[in-house]
């Protein structure tokens, strides 16, 4: 009942008394994929600050500080990709509280496309960059894509590196082969989302595999 009363008072912008340094209603807030805004209630008896722990182009807050019991308006864009989150960090004196703002996926995993259209590549010994044709509908999640490489043989020194991923191609760079023998690598592109709202373990999806043989 006390929490409910506090929320109503904060929502109405009425002054209330709070005898603790800093408090939030929860550690998680689940956001709809369609986008919008939501009020975050902050309870404090002193000055406080808030920031996003890492920048997110899809989210914004209307203030960076406040005093006493108040609220922060968190705005978020429509999510056309997989689940994502940003963490708000509140601080008052020496106390720190975090709030996970988790946004639901805008696309089902079963509908995700990540297809590399070149099944194999015979690379020259001198190395260099190579473009692979790529078909994906995760065009809003490209920055979170990674390259997964499995090397054949005993020498696992990395020699295949990701340069960039776009909606129509994956660019990798290959080191010069100084081993004196051909070498092979199996390559996939992966994307890891934020998993469930109350978990720090994401779910990873993979593209098809391509084989690279370097002379």
Regions found by a protein language model. Name each.
Residues 98-100, 195-206:
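Beta-sandwich strand segments
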Residues 26-32, 117-124, 160-161:
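Short beta-strand segments of immunoglobulin-like
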Residues 19-27, 109-118:
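Proline-enriched interdomain boundary motifs that mark the N-terminal boundary
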Residues 101-107, 210-215:
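Interdomain boundary/hinge segments at the C-termini of tandem beta-sandwich modules
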């Amino acid at each position: 009942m006390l929490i409910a009363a506090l929320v109503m008072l904060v929502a109405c912008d009425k002054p209330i008394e709070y005898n603790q340094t800093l408090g939030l209603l929860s550690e998680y807030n689940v956001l709809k994929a369609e986008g919008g805004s939501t009020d975050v209630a902050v309870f404090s008896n002193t000055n406080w600050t808030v920031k996003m722990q890492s920048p997110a182009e899809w989210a914004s807050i209307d203030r960076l500080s406040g005093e006493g019991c108040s609220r922060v308006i968190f705005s978020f864009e429509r999510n056309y990709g997989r689940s994502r989150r940003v963490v708000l960090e509140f601080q008052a004196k020496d106390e720190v509280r975090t709030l996970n703002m988790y946004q639901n996926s805008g696309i089902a995993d079963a509908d995700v496309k990540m297809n590399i259209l070149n099944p194999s590549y015979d690379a020259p010994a001198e190395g260099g960059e190579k473009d692979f044709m790529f078909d994906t509908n995760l065009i809003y999640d490209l920055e979170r894509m990674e390259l997964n490489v499995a090397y054949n043989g005993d020498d696992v020194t990395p020699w295949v590196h990701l340069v960039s991923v776009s909606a129509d191609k994956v660019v990798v760079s290959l080191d010069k082969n100084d081993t004196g023998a051909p070498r092979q690598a199996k390559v996939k592109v992966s994307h890891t989302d934020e998993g469930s709202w109350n978990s720090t373990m994401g779910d990873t999806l993979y593209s098809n595999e391509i084989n690279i043989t370097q002379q």
